[in-house]
């Protein structure tokens, strides 16, 4: 039974950076081009080709380190990680080992209302390997377009005790790197992928159990499935009196199981040593402070401001802050209109619905914050009702016209003349005498029927507040 054991999880996250070129050469990192069309002597590992470090990669690493509460090393070193694999043309990977650029950070997560701090051991820069393409037969081909693509590896402490905590940490980290603009966050294309180190130990035991490493999983759902399966697998082995083997395992998405890939290597197996072709990286305090000043407002700070300064509920704040572009849209809308809660309702409601229906992102939204603010202002001054406002919004989405033009062209201005509304009410009540008697006999739910009839007669233009007040007076005889 897994309840007999404490779960210990540490994560290694590989983040592909959104630079235009590779980490040590000027080749493009664009995804999906012809195999081996984005290569040069450096990323092909040809003799005599020398690497030159991409400054933007360093900036992105520092930015991520600051956002995850890390210390930035004033001096760091690139090292050669030696191993043989067909997609590694040099026979080694340029990475960082003893002196990474960022260390000793943390991320705070929340699981079921409980907060927890997860330590970050280190963040280091490295190059990606190429990609093996397997044919239907018994041959494989190598595409080296991905070789030398810039990566950050973010290594956590083994502080997570469940798959839920692991997923909360990953989602928080994913949100941060996308917010910073250092990664596009595309899991399907491998821009954000994870290795999970999973072990279990009897409750109360201080020593860690033997861990298995689950490799290159690129879906939050699959990561959770893989961790949960691995916990059960190890518990079954220990319950049967067996010994867990330290190894690397692959997750099979079809069966929902993990299978052994190879024995797990230790650091000494890679024979790390400083890369003689790259000088030590020196990072000045001034450079770090310049990057710190350029950091965007991060999700936690944004949520706190939305709740504390704008007064919207915590749930609304979390939804709006989840995406940086959406949060910036909301901020602009509040500045243009002022009513933070009404703005939140419209962004999370009608705007999100239209985006979902069209498949567009917020960057392609045809309704700008000032345009949407124009609709909300016409709700405020009773020119249109909330229901009519949705019609105006749909027309605005299609035409790009402002609210006043749409209201005027389509004759959508709300009827507020009490005399006109009263006349329609009289007609509706006269046409439905039996329903009037039932209402007066205690069937209060019929109020909705009468409101609907009046709205139908006025084509939805009757002011709802005025309509309800007049209708109630007519029906009760007050």
Curated annotation (Swiss-Prot):
Which Gene3D superfamilies does the record associate with it? 1.10.10.410, GatB domain, N-terminal subdomain
- Asked if the keyword Transport belongs to this entry, the reply reads no
Ordered alphabetically, the record's keywords are: ATP-binding, Ligase, Nucleotide-binding, Protein biosynthesis
What EC number(s) has UniProt assigned to this enzyme? 6.3.5.-
Gene Ontology terms: biological process: glutaminyl-tRNAGln biosynthesis via transamidation; translation
For molecular function, the Gene Ontology terms on record are: asparaginyl-tRNA synthase (glutamine-hydrolyzing) activity; ATP binding; glutaminyl-tRNA synthase (glutamine-hydrolyzing) activity
Any Pfam family the entry gives: GatB_N
What PROSITE patterns does the entry give? GATB
Disulfide linkages recorded for this protein, renumbered to the chain, are none
Reactions that this protein is recorded to catalyse: L-glutamyl-tRNA(Gln) + L-glutamine + ATP + H2O = L-glutaminyl-tRNA(Gln) + L-glutamate + ADP + phosphate + H(+); L-aspartyl-tRNA(Asn) + L-glutamine + ATP + H2O = L-asparaginyl-tRNA(Asn) + L-glutamate + ADP + phosphate + 2 H(+)
Describe, as the record does, how this protein assembles with itself and its partners.
Heterotrimer of A, B and C subunits.
This chain's function reads:
Allows the formation of correctly charged Asn-tRNA(Asn) or Gln-tRNA(Gln) through the transamidation of misacylated Asp-tRNA(Asn) or Glu-tRNA(Gln) in organisms which lack either or both of asparaginyl-tRNA or glutaminyl-tRNA synthetases. The reaction takes place in the presence of glutamine and ATP through an activated phospho-Asp-tRNA(Asn) or phospho-Glu-tRNA(Gln).
Family in the record:
Belongs to the GatB/GatE family. GatB subfamily.
Q: What is this protein called?
A: Aspartyl/glutamyl-tRNA(Asn/Gln) amidotransferase subunit B
The organism that produces this protein has a lineage beginning with: Bacteria, Pseudomonadati, Thermodesulfobacteriota, Desulfuromonadia, Desulfuromonadales
Its encoding gene is what?
Answer: gatB
């Amino acid at each position: 039974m897994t309840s007999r054991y404490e779960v210990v999880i540490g994560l290694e996250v590989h983040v592909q950076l959104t630079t235009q070129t590779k980490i040590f050469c000027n080749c493009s990192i664009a995804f999906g081009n012809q195999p081996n069309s984005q290569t040069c002597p450096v990323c092909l590992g040809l003799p005599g080709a020398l690497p030159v470090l991409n400054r933007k990669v360093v900036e992105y690493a520092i930015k991520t380190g600051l956002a995850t509460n890390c210390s930035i090393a004033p001096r760091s070193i690139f090292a050669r990680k030696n191993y043989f694999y067909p997609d590694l043309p040099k026979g080694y990977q340029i990475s960082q080992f003893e002196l990474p650029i960022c260390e000793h950070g943390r991320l705070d997560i929340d699981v079921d209302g409980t907060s927890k701090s997860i330590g970050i051991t280190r963040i280091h820069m490295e190059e990606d390997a190429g990609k093996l393409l397997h044919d239907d037969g018994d041959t494989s081909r190598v595409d080296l377009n991905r070789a030398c693509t810039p990566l950050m590896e973010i290594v956590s402490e083994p502080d997570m005790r469940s798959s839920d905590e692991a997923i909360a940490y990953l989602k928080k980290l994913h949100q941060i790197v996308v917010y910073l603009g250092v990664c596009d966050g595309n899991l399907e294309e491998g821009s954000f992928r994870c290795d999970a180190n999973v072990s279990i130990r009897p409750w109360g035991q201080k020593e860690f159990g033997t861990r298995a490493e689950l490799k290159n999983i690129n879906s939050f759902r699959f990561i959770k499935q893989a961790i949960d399966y691995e916990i059960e697998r190890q518990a079954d082995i220990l319950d049967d009196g067996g010994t867990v083997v330290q190894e690397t395992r692959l997750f099979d998405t079809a069966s929902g199981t993990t299978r052994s890939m190879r024995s797990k290597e230790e650091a000494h197996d890679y024979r790390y040593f400083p890369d003689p072709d790259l000088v030590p990286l020196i990072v000045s305090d001034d450079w770090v402070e310049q990057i710190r000043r350029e950091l965007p407002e991060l999700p936690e700070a944004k949520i706190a401001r939305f709740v504390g300064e704008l007064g919207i509920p915590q749930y609304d704040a979390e939804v709006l802050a989840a995406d940086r572009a959406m949060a910036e849209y909301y901020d602009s809308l509040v500045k243009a209109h002022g009513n933070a809660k009404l703005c939140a309702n419209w962004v999370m409601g009608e705007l999100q619905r239209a985006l979902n229906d069209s498949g567009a992102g917020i960057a392609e939204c045809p309704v700008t914050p000032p345009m949407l603010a124009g609709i909300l202002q016409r709700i405020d001054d009773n020119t249109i009702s909330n229901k009519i406002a949705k019609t105006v919004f749909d027309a605005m989405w299609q035409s790009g016209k402002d609210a006043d033009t749409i209201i005027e062209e389509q004759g959508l201005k709300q009827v507020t003349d009490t005399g006109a509304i009263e006349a329609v009410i009289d007609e509706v009540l006269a046409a439905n005498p039996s329903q009037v008697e039932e209402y007066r006999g205690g069937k209060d739910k019929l109020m909705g029927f009468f409101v609907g009839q009046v709205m139908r007669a006025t084509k939805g233009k009757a002011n709802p507040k005025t309509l309800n007040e007049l209708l109630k007076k007519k029906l009760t005889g007050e």
